[in-house]
Amino acid sequence: MSSIRKKDVERFILSDDYKPMVLKELYKKFRAKTREQRKKVREVVKKLEKEGRIFRDSRGRYRKLGEDLKVGTIEFTRSGYVAFVITDDFEEIAVPVEDTKYAMHKDRVVVEITGTWRGLPRGRVVRVLERGLKRVVGVFDHKGTFGFVVPDDPKIAYDFYVAPENIDGAKPNQKVIAEILKYPSPGKNPEAKVVKVLGDLDDPSIDLPSVIVKHDLPEPGEFPEEVIREANAIPARVRKKDLVGRKDLRDKVIVTIDGEDAKDFDDAISVEKLPNGNYLLGVHIADVSHYVKEGSALDQEAFKRGTSVYLIDTVIPMLPFRLSNGICSLVEGKDRLTMSVEMEIDRDGRVVRYDVYPSVIKSKKRMIYERVNEFLEDPSSMKEYEPFKDLIYNAVELAEILREARRKRGAILDIESDEVKVILDENGQVVDIVPRKRGIAEKLIEEFMIRANETVAEIFDHAGLPFMYRVHEEPDPETIFQLKNYLEAMGIRAKFSHKIHPGMLQKLLEKVKDHPLRSSVERLLVRSMKRAMYSAVNIGHFGLASYAYTHFTSPIRRYPDLVVHRLLKLYLEQNGYFTPEQIEKFSKVLPKIAKHCSRRERVADEAEWDLVAMKKVEYIARHIGEVFNVVVTNITKFGLFVEIPEKSISGLVHISTLDDYYYYDETRNMLIGKRKGKVFRLGDVLKAKVVRADKIRGEIDFVLVEEDEE
């Protein structure tokens, strides 16, 4: 009996000679008669199907993907008219809802390209490969003896039928978690069973678990047993043998500067002024790779998570707290293992010399952003920082030099964040929402981390070795043309050349620095940008105007940084050389890691945004009927999106509530009244009354009011 080799089966299926076959035909082809032989064939088929290289058609045949067939994750929209399939290469394919073939939000699907739609490829779903959702969170609705779960996520187009035996004591209008039993099919709703009743809709404590289930995140602080076992086996202190091959920096003045609530300290800095007038900047990053070994249970779980998720006052860490808040965290007064990037920087912001090496440090002070800013305002107010004044003043000087150097090369610097801090009480209820301010301390740490990330990326770019880059594509020319039209409609003239460069956009920001519409221009600019992501191919970072960039500085909370540390260590150990086998290995695995981590980052961002949006609705619900000054942030054919600037709370003024029949001028992004000729533009400051706040949908409605209506 001849043995069957999996690689032969895979080679045949992927060959040009292969014609679509059912499983029985593959068994026959390879003379697979025993259970073990057939199992090998099935395993290859399942592997290729999971990788999206083949799929099973309606006749049960396994087909290869041709030019007209793509595999990706389907994402529905709130409107429900169209969905988008995001391929593994981040290509977007528009799929009209009637062509989604019972696929649900987040399913992995095969889509056939059928044409174009608004500049994107248009397609239809031909098969669901893998269901993306296993659980759903929503509101329970009782219908006689049975019930339905109405999902919180408007992107899920179905309500889930719940049989009487699966209600589990849920009452109408309670938030529940339900396990999906059956997925949609012709003429039938999907089915689910209630597995947990979270509570009543007005209970603020249900928001966090709702977001966790909606985005399929792990429970805070929970890890698989094997991961916990590995973490517990790691020593809680640095040992003598850990210091071999490391530069001892424990006597140097090295400090951390972070937010008041931070517990996982990834990065520390040292700054000295040299006799020649240059600066010596040290960026010292937690050596997580010393403890988290490639292929270990800790590593596999960190890869799966991809990133830590910060949900207001709760963190879902990438690594167990024993590491993230313990031995890896650069806490004051404790020996800690680090990877150091030491850079001599001249008065023009150029790195004239650098060194990268494994090290051991002992942080001399755990500084806090707000207190450093207070010290810079009034040194006498912060006596505890007095011994570190030289470091602080040198850091401020150097950060300004680096920032000016980035400005000169065209980096986009002047976009003010509209991030807010949500303050909760012990019950999870919103007390207040305040702008998250960024002072000098926050900006100087940002400058130092950017420079360290660039230095590490440049090493690998020059060496031509496989690497994990952080890339940011330039905007599409059509988007910039549209931006120009919008700006002109706001009365702001902008000169854009055919060759798009970040310096053009930075000049625009400088031009509107003191303009009343500055924040509106910044929003438009952000909207016109593409999303930064991870890639094994270096295409540069548009926003930073960096020709090579990476993420090296946060390995406690980002998996790509951990990968970069491993690559950097190997580079140093092997004197800037990778073996052919290593090059082959990294060339295969790095693109997969980059795609996965880009997806996980997106999930984390959406979860963080969702919870903040819920809390904004909860906050504004206490102000129904009140009038606020608002700014128009977006205009659509169905109304105006407006924002309360000091709270970053947005909502809709529906076109049906306006005082005239308005038509939408898409080119200039305006609503124009037909009878009165009144025009609404981006950046308009108006008065609006809050009339509705729907926490489940995350929606807020306003109506405009005249001065005399207040």
Curated annotation (Swiss-Prot):
Write down the superkingdom of origin: Bacteria
A Gene Ontology cellular component where this protein is annotated is:
cytosol
In short, the EC number is: 3.1.13.1
Q: Which reactions are catalysed by this chain? A: Exonucleolytic cleavage in the 3'- to 5'-direction to yield nucleoside 5'-phosphates
Write one Gene Ontology MF term.
RNA binding
| Keywords of the record | Cytoplasm, Exonuclease, Hydrolase, Nuclease, RNA-binding
Domain named RNB is located at 246-573
Q: Which SMART domains match?
A: CSP (SM00357), RNB (SM00955), S1 (SM00316)
- Residues covered by the S1 motif domain: 625-705
Query: What biological-process terms (Gene Ontology) are attached?
Result: mRNA catabolic process
Per its UniProt record, what InterPro entries does this chain match?
CSD, CSD2, NA-bd_OB-fold, RNase_B_OB_dom, RNase_II/R, RNase_II/R_CS, RNase_II/RNase_R, RNase_R
Where would you find this protein in the cell? Answer: Cytoplasm
The family classification in the record reads: Belongs to the RNR ribonuclease family. RNase R subfamily.
Function, as annotated, reads:
3'-5' exoribonuclease that releases 5'-nucleoside monophosphates and is involved in maturation of structured RNAs.
HAMAP family, alphabetized:
RNase_R (MF_01895)
Q: What is this protein called?
A: Ribonuclease R
Ranked from the top, the taxonomy reads: Bacteria, Thermotogati, Thermotogota, Thermotogae, Thermotogales
What gene name is listed for this protein?
Answer: rnr
